[in-house]
Amino acid sequence: MSINATLLGQTLAFIIFVWCCMKFVWPPLMAAIEARQKAIADGLSSAERAKKDLDLAKANATDQLKEAKLQAAQIIEQANKRKAQIIDEAAVGAHTEREKILAQGRAEIDAERHRAKEELRKQVAALAIAGAEKILARHIDQAANSDIVDKLVAEL
């Protein structure tokens, strides 16, 4: 009987121990485990949100980069068109200025040529008159006429 009483005492002590553990130890342990599970779940969900936010930010950055590249290409294209336009305008302006200067130079050359011709005509007329006076002043003979004409030709 003593074994039965010991066994019954141990069983009763075990039941009291289990009841005390269930009443006083188990609830704080369960609360700590549940809090830890909640913290882990919150951490996982926040990591998932952060990953989604990162993917969204990467997508936005990629889109903005593509848009910036397109805008840069458009700006460069517009600048090249404007450069070509400015070069064409400068070429047309330079060509017009060149034609104007050439026309002015030609006009000056023509005026100078005309003035030189007029001066030359006056000199030729003066020489012809002087030669005619010399011929008329001398006797009319062939040798003298030929000599005077040769001198006039040499002067011209």
Curated annotation (Swiss-Prot):
Residue intervals passing through the bilayer: 13-33
UniProt keyword terms in alphabetical order: ATP synthesis, Cell inner membrane, Cell membrane, CF(0), Hydrogen ion transport, Ion transport, Membrane, Transmembrane, Transmembrane helix, Transport
Membrane topology (UniProt): Single-pass membrane protein
Compartment list: Cell inner membrane
Highest taxon of the lineage: Bacteria
SUPFAM superfamilies reported for this sequence: F1F0 ATP synthase subunit B, membrane domain
GO cellular component: plasma membrane; proton-transporting ATP synthase complex
Gene Ontology MF term list: proton-transporting ATP synthase activity, rotational mechanism; proton-transporting ATPase activity, rotational mechanism
Pfam families associated with the record: ATP-synt_B
Homology family: Belongs to the ATPase B chain family.
Subunit structure comment from the entry: F-type ATPases have 2 components, F(1) - the catalytic core - and F(0) - the membrane proton channel. F(1) has five subunits: alpha(3), beta(3), gamma(1), delta(1), epsilon(1). F(0) has three main subunits: a(1), b(2) and c(10-14). The alpha and beta chains form an alternating ring which encloses part of the gamma chain. F(1) is attached to F(0) by a central stalk formed by the gamma and epsilon chains, while a peripheral stalk is formed by the delta and b chains.
Protein name (Swiss-Prot/TrEMBL): ATP synthase subunit b
Native source species: Aeromonas salmonicida (strain A449)
Gene this chain is encoded by: atpF
